[in-house]
Structures are given as structure tokens and as C-alpha cells.
Regions:
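Nucleic-acid endo/exonuclease domains
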Residues: 1-137
Length: 137
């Protein structure tokens, strides 16, 4: 499949190794719970998990190629300094820059992003996503 990398250059990427296994835990427990939620709506779609961001070492939690939707799940380390994850405040700030690069890459490739924080998993529903993001899943 053709994508633009983070620099805007077109590249080919084989998506087959990243096709979602709905029953396998990859990543955090929260990520698995989000995956199980989307399974009921997306089981017949082309979905990749832990998909590489071309031109970087970053990955996207989920990409629905059928609907052009990316889903990112975030733990508390995403918006709060956690010494175990970040080691220092500089690394914490760098994580924001990486997120910006990732979201720019997703936009460059025509994907809409859904961000779900740990404390929002309990609220997950088709209606909640429509209300919060304006997206039909």
C-alpha cells in the first residue's frame, strides 16, 4: 500500500504483518479493551494494529483502512509527567513533539484520529464517539 512518510515522500508498505488479531493482546490492557470495543463494528474492515509511522520509529495503535480512521489509546503518562516512563521533564516534552509528528503523518495520509484516554474507556459507545469526535464508526 502507498503512503507518504513523515517527510511527504511516497513509500510502499506491506500492511499484512500488522493486520489485527482481535484476540491477541498487543500493547497495554487499555489498548486491548479499546480493540475489543471496536471489534463489534470493524470485524469485517481492514484494520492494522501497532502500524509503523513511515519515516520514524513510532507506531499507531489502530488504523482502519476501510474508514480511514486511526485510534490512539493513551495512558496517564500521555498528559502527565510519570518518572518511570519519561525519566525527566525534557523527555516528557519530547513525547508531545512525537505525537504532533504522528498526527501530522496521519493527516497527511488522510486519516481522522480518535484519541481515547484510559479514563474514557468506560464511556466507549458508538454515540460517545459520534458526540466527541463527530465520526461514525
Amino acid at each position: 500500500m502507498k503512503f507518504k512518510n513523515i517527510y511527504g515522500r511516497e513509500v510502499n508498505k506491506n500492511i499484512t504483518p500488522y493486520i489485527v488479531d482481535w484476540n491477541k493482546v498487543r500493547g497495554s490492557k487499555a489498548q486491548f479493551n479499546v480493540k475489543k470495543f471496536f471489534e463489534q463494528f470493524w470485524v469485517a474492515h481492514v484494520i492494522c494494529e501497532e502500524f509503523p509511522v513511515s519515516g520514524s520509529r513510532m507506531r499507531c495503535d489502530f488504523i482502519n483502512f476501510t474508514k480511514k480512521i486511526a485510534v490512539e489509546t493513551h495512558g496517564q503518562q500521555h498528559d502527565k509527567f510519570i518518572p518511570f516512563f519519561h525519566k525527566n521533564r525534557t523527555n516528557f516534552k519530547k513525547s508531545f513533539k512525537r505525537d504532533l509528528v504522528k498526527y501530522n503523518w496521519l493527516e497527511l495520509n488522510g486519516f481522522t484520529v480518535i484519541e481515547i484516554f484510559d479514563n474514557e474507556i468506560k464511556d466507549l459507545s458508538r454515540e460517545w464517539i459520534k458526540e466527541k469526535f463527530g465520526i461514525e464508526i
